[in-house]
Amino acid sequence: MASNQKVIYVYESFRSTTPNFLGTLFVENVRGRESYSFEYDADWLKSSANYMYLDPDLQMYAGRQYPTGAKNVFGLFTDSSPDRWGRLLMTRRERILAEQEGRKPRKLLDSDFLLGVYDETRMGAIRFKLDKDGPFLSDDSKTPTPPWTSLRTLEEASRQFENDESGLEQKWIDQLIKPGSSLGGARPKATVLDTSGNLWIAKFPSKHDDVNVGAWEKVTHDLARLCGLDVPESMLIDFSKYGSTFLVRRFDRNGAARIHFASAMTMLGKTDGASAADGSSYLELVSFIKANGAAPKRDLTELWKRIVFNMAVSNTDDHMRNHGFILKADGWHLSPLYDVNPVPEGDELSLCVNEDDATISLDLALEIAPYCEISTKDATAMAADILKTVRDNWNRLAAECGLSRSAQEYMRPAFSLALE
């Protein structure tokens, strides 16, 4: 039986700007199928005796540990890996290299995708090496993170890349692979650096868009801010006739310091695709915050208001990957809101609100308010304020984002709860 092992050295940069050796990730490859195990570094465990766990499948003790259930890879490392867009870029790059070298394309495995993300823009604060004395991976000191001034070029590259059916135009891959491989989701995107040294995510128009997705995400983002929700800084720029580019400042960085981010999928021990269909619920997020949150009262209120807001704008893509937590010195905090978009035909959320119902219904949200330690009186007032804010501002914000009256009428059903 053909087998070989890859040893990956794992570091964290969330306790200081100096990387700390976290442990060793072992990847066993048997006939093209990988299996994973991880072992914490003994010194890291000693220095982190009272630290919060990083993954429910990785308990704070010495010795090899293995993923449980249907998972093949620990969620801690899934969060550091690219999603569909980044994987597509890496797969296309491998096809190009194979053609240049006159060989068959190599099938990329999970560890290839994990190590193929550029360290400089990798999400969160987990980092990887194949040699303890070598660079963090992936490394490319010759090509820095693209500056703000390259946004127009990057948008054009993403469009050409999507329209290149052969997938073998290297110049588009070269421009997109570094800034885009670190990010999740399926849409074209890239990380760029502003003049103050801050990282931003740029989400570009896609050829598959039926509406101006970037403009509508900016509308909902600004509505969330008006509703008092925790959202990062954002802006909207038009570079072409194909749609708007939505930019949002990354919340996993504070200057040069990295902030550890974990998706709710990871911290709740879920697998990709977990949804209302299998009973995944907001109540599980509530339980996690109560058990592990550093500021449970604040985060429970914030989470409940987000549920109401998601209903008010019909954000039906609120799955476990689109909720997350950031790790600070005092423990886990609910991350800022991200990836919120209106859906005109949406009538159910991705997650159950209570134990078994995902319907967009204010009554359901009010039903679980006590679990979030919010009185019925306060919840009713908060919900009324959110709905009024959405009702009074969505048209105005849409117009400010350049959306036509017909575009607004098309999207009107998404705001039906607020308009009732």
Where are these predicted regions, by residue range?
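Phosphate/dinucleotide-binding and metal-coordinating scaffold of catalytic cores
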Residues: 1-320, 324-420
